[in-house]
């Protein structure tokens, strides 16, 4: 069990909260997280790249010139891959890049990745009530009060983010908002700092504890 210091949105200390998640063994954690990230990135690929082979390119049915007597290399079609406008040899065709990983492994990888970033956590009291209308500057100032630089990539994890918070964060290039029950390994590892709402900690333990 790890105890985290909770801060108010103004940066002052507010108390403490505990988080206890089962993680992978140190000997296998790196491989597990690596496979989880590969799966996530592979499954995002559309796999729609497609080229035409020699037989699929339009035209080229007639032999361009006679076989012998021209002094040139023999050609059977103007759509040969050797000529501009011809077919493509071993080009890509639509395919699925999806990788499989069972649910227990995915959950274990996520918990391990999350707990490995514990030193980069900024646990805050839920600050949705402090914003009555979308205001990007308030998010910027709030992150600054938490000791986060403007150049750092930030992942904000909240239990049930309101539309006001979503709109306030939407314009910030280096800040990403995600719900506590929709976490993924890549975003956790890609961020420099993780700002987690106090109720999100409870939600994470409820959803990902097993």
Curated annotation (Swiss-Prot):
Against InterPro entries, the record matches this protein to: Ribosomal_uL4 (IPR002136), Ribosomal_uL4-like (IPR013005), Ribosomal_uL4_dom_sf (IPR023574)
Q: Does the keyword Ribonucleoprotein apply?
A: yes
GO terms of biological process kind: translation
Which residue stretches belong to region Disordered?
44-94
Task: State where composition is biased (Polar residues).
Answer: 44-54
Record-linked Pfam families: Ribosomal_L4
Q: Where is the composition biased (Basic residues)?
A: 60-71
GO molecular function term, any single one: structural constituent of ribosome
Name the job this protein performs.
One of the primary rRNA binding proteins, this protein initially binds near the 5'-end of the 23S rRNA. It is important during the early stages of 50S assembly. It makes multiple contacts with different domains of the 23S rRNA in the assembled 50S subunit and ribosome. Forms part of the polypeptide exit tunnel.
Family of the protein in this entry: Belongs to the universal ribosomal protein uL4 family.
> What name has this protein been given in UniProt?
Large ribosomal subunit protein uL4
Name the gene: rplD
């Amino acid at each position: 069990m790890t105890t985290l210091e909770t801060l108010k949105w103004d940066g002052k200390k507010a108390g403490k909260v505990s988080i206890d998640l089962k993680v992978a063994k140190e000997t296998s954690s790196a491989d597990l997280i690596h496979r989880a990230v590969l799966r996530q990135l592979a499954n995002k690929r559309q796999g729609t790249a497609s080229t035409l082979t020699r037989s699929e390119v339009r035209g080229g049915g007639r032999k361009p010139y006679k076989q012998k007597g021209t002094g040139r290399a023999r050609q059977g079609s103007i759509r040969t891959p050797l000529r501009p406008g011809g077919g493509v040899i071993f080009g890509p065709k639509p395919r699925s890049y999806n990788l499989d990983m069972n649910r227990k492994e995915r959950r274990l990888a996520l918990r391990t990745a999350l707990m490995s970033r514990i030193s980069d956590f900024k646990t805050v009291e839920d600050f949705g009530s402090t914003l009555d209308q979308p205001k990007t500057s308030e998010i910027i100032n709030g992150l600054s009060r938490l000791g986060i630089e403007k150049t750092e990539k930030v992942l904000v994890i909240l239990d049930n983010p309101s539309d006001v918070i979503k709109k306030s964060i939407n314009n910030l290039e280096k800040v990403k908002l995600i719900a506590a029950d929709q976490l993924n390994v890549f975003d956790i590892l890609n961020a420099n700092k993780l700002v987690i709402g106090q109720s999100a900690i409870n939600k994470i333990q409820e959803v990902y504890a097993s």
